A protein has these predicted regions:
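Accessory nucleic acid-recognition modules appended to NTPase machines
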Residues: 3-153
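Short active-site-adjacent structural elements
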Residues: 144, 165-167, 195-199
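Active-site ExK catalytic segment of metal-dependent nucleases
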Residues: 149, 154-165
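Domain-level recognition of nuclease-like catalytic cores that cleave nucleotide substrates
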Residues: 192-211
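Short, hydrophobic beta-strand segments that form beta-sheet elements in well-ordered domains
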Residues: 185-191
Length: 211
């Protein structure tokens, strides 16, 4: 599809969502403009949790929470929760990449959303008992963007948004290996380069290898 066609699709879907679909839930008395602003905030915020979305759109958090609940039910957004051992709050993402283009989301947000959607699709396709993915973060570290428990191991994957990386990007994996020393782990770093190799039991892979 051309850029114009993608933009028209985004506008049509947004119009249906904020002007029709959300108003089927009459008890909430939703506002179309607020709904559109919330979707825009989800697209552009680096850390799109409830508090940050509320602050961005200047709508009380409890009210924003109602919008998020219904937008999830309508399959417009999805939620990534922190793991049970992690710091941080749940984050929300748009479920269609076309909307990211419409809202002028950053390159980093597009890459991260695409990776989350790919993993959710793969886990659903493989009919995994648990297709819940989460993120892992300590109070002082940058996040490991993806964590999920498979049948006999735990997967941790960090996304680097550059074509190269350095040792600082790998530091969080040291604490993960210590914390989960009794578990079988699979550790990944996805980056914008082309080469595939291992560093200290961490598989370094290009972004597209997740497909």
């Amino acid at each position: 599809r051309s850029a114009n066609e993608r933009e028209q699709l985004a506008q049509d879907w947004l119009a249906l969502t904020v002007e029709r679909d959300i108003h089927q839930f009459t008890k909430y008395k939703f506002d179309s403009d607020d709904a559109l602003e919330i979707l825009n905030a989800i697209a552009i915020l680096e850390n799109p949790n409830l508090a940050n979305i509320s602050k961005k759109v200047k709508v009380p958090a409890r009210r924003v929470q109602s919008y998020l609940k219904i937008l999830k039910m309508l399959f417009v957004i999805f939620e990534i929760t922190p793991s049970k051992d992690s710091a941080g709050k749940s984050q929300f993402f748009l479920i269609d990449p076309i909307l990211l283009g419409h809202f002028k989301a950053s390159f980093e947000k597009k890459i991260l959303t695409w990776i989350y959607l790919e993993m959710l699709c793969q886990l659903s396709y493989k009919a995994k008992k648990s297709n819940r993915i989460s993120f892992y973060k300590t109070a002082k570290s940058s996040p490991v963007h993806l964590m999920y428990e498979a049948d006999n191991h735990i997967v941790f994957a960090k996304v680097c948004f550059e074509q190269s990386f350095d040792s600082r990007d790998l530091l969080i994996f040291d604490s993960i290996k210590k914390k989960y020393k009794d578990k079988k782990l699979k550790l990944y770093l996805f980056y914008g380069g082309r080469e595939r190799f291992n560093v200290d039991e961490i598989q370094i892979l290009p972004w597209e290898s997740i497909v």
